[in-house]
């Protein structure tokens, strides 16, 4: 297997892998510009290869990852108006308190059963380790960064929704901890 890093605005620095036969590897040759050759195939420019190298046998970009990272962007009432944000940020009509959101988010950090914050799948575990969660405002836009060993289905979206309630003053840190402890999803 081989892997490369792809980069675009949304999926910046993602790792992908490509399984090639020995014949395909031979055709690539020892060209020092393998990245350039691959980028010619990716003509739209939305994704490009920055680095390419052989990976250990059995490597899988999805299942061999040490952790996963999401950055969720929210443009609220106090954010600058920008047409560039339309594709990359959730718009929220009221001003959010990102400091309260950050404080409340810390209740979710650590190894927990996140059944309350995801849509469980058959035979799938909802136990995850949320290694980092932060809420900051950068250039007027709220960024929620989550790093975990893995994320359950809809987990990030559900956590972000709960944090928006905190930022709106409709929920507290204690509410987030209480919901987490329930280990049962109460709404869709």
Residue ranges of model-derived segments:
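A common structural junction motif
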Residues: 40-46, 163-168
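Short, structured active-site "lid" loops
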Residues: 12-37
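Non-catalytic RNA-recognition surface used by pseudouridine synthases
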Residues: 46-147
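Short amphipathic alpha-helical signal-transduction/dimerization elements
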Residues: 106-109, 160-168
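Conserved helix-adjacent loop modules within structured domains
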Residues: 139, 143-153, 170-174, 178-179
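Single conserved hydrophobic/aromatic residue that forms the stacking wall/gate
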Residues: 1-7, 11
């Amino acid at each position: 297997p081989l892997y490369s890093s792809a980069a675009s605005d949304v999926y910046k620095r993602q790792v992908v892998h490509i399984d090639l036969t020995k014949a395909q590897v031979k055709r690539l040759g020892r060209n020092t510009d393998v990245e350039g050759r691959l980028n010619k195939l990716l003509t739209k420019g939305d994704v490009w290869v920055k680095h390419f190298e052989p990976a250990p046998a059995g490597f899988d970009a999805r299942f061999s990852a040490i952790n996963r990272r999401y950055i969720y962007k929210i443009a609220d009432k106090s954010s600058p108006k920008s047409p560039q944000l339309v594709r990359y940020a959730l718009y929220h009509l009221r001003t959010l308190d990102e400091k309260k959101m950050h404080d409340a988010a810390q209740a979710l950090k650590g190894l927990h059963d996140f059944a309350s914050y995801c849509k469980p799948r058959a035979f799938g575990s909802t136990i995850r380790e949320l290694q980092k969660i932060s809420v900051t405002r950068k250039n007027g836009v709220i960024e929620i960064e989550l790093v975990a060993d893995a994320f359950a289905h809809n987990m990030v979206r559900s956590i972000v929704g709960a944090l928006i309630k905190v930022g709106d003053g409709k929920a507290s840190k204690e509410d987030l901890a209480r919901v987490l402890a329930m280990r049962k999803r109460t709404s869709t």
